[in-house]
């Protein structure tokens, strides 16, 4: 994931910062506890496509 893209994308729910998880290919919103998938290098920033994070994942 291009670091420049991370500077301009935001969580569609809260407009907060997103963090890239290289291992799971997801963009993480720690505020809402959501993980958005990245498919073929393209972030899928749709709330209904997001995965709810567990408490242990949010604190990482």
Swiss-Prot record:
InterPro entries: Trm112-like
Disulfide bridge map: none
Entry GO terms, CC: cytosol
Family assignment from sequence similarity: Belongs to the UPF0434 family.
Full protein name: UPF0434 protein PC1_1771
Native source organism of the sequence: Pectobacterium carotovorum subsp. carotovorum (strain PC1)
Lineage of the organism: Bacteria, Pseudomonadati, Pseudomonadota, Gammaproteobacteria, Enterobacterales
């Amino acid at each position: 994931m291009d670091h420049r893209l991370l500077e301009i994308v935001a969580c569609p729910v809260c407009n907060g910062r997103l963090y890239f998880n290289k291992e799971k290919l997801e963009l993480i919103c720690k505020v809402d506890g959501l993980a958005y998938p990245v498919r073929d290098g393209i972030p899928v920033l749709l709330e209904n496509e997001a995965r709810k994070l567990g408490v242990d994942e949010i604190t990482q």
